[in-house]
Amino acid sequence: MSNTCRIVLFYLITCIFTCSASDAPKVRVNSGDIAGGYEYTYSGRKIYSFLGIPYASPPVQNYRFKEPQPVKPWLGTWNATIPGSSCMGPDYESNFKLVGQEDCLYLNVYTPKLPRENTPDDLMDVVVHIHGGAFMSGEGISLGPQYLLDINNFVYVTINYRVGVLGFATTGDNILPANNGMKDQVAALKWIQQNIVA
């Protein structure tokens, strides 16, 4: 391939990535700027998606068995085009193989309209999906927006929360307090309440 073809190909690829990055939907939440993407419902309706948004700090190391801590602000723009990891637990569909990570307190937001398209009189309802799994397994991304937002106009949010031992083990004292997975859910709901109009 000649150098001229390589240069033209390089500029073409650069233009494609630059155009798609500048076309990304952007919002600002309390922790910083977020750039999302697009998805399509079953009937082909285009919706905005913001995936893998942290609603609390990662519950790792000294915070492993503690209640969720506030998310720290980030510099730059958060890439919200990739779902955050599911929380660590068994995958019942693959012979109880352990899946997920400890750094898992993320949520996903799907909406047919961005806030700048809404007037105060045109705000949408918010539906939050908290996955099941007997507090042992599951992930927020398991029920996507493809059907729910096909003809409905509301903001749809899914969350991850700690499951199993990391979310619900307790020693009955302050060393290992109970129900951190439930406290994760409350932290996610508070984050949604404070940031969803972004």
From Swiss-Prot:
One of its GO terms (molecular function) is carboxylesterase activity. InterPro entries: AB_hydrolase_fold (IPR029058), CarbesteraseB (IPR002018), Carboxylesterase_B_CS (IPR019819), Type-B_Carboxylest/Lipase (IPR050309). Glycans are attached at residue 79. Keywords: Disulfide bond, Glycoprotein, Hydrolase, Serine esterase, Signal. Gene3D superfamilies: alpha/beta hydrolase. It catalyses: a carboxylic ester + H2O = an alcohol + a carboxylate + H(+). It comes from the Eukaryota. The keyword Manganese does not apply. Belongs to the type-B carboxylesterase/lipase family. Overproduction of nonspecific esterases is a common mechanism of resistance to organophosphate insecticides. This is Esterase SG1.
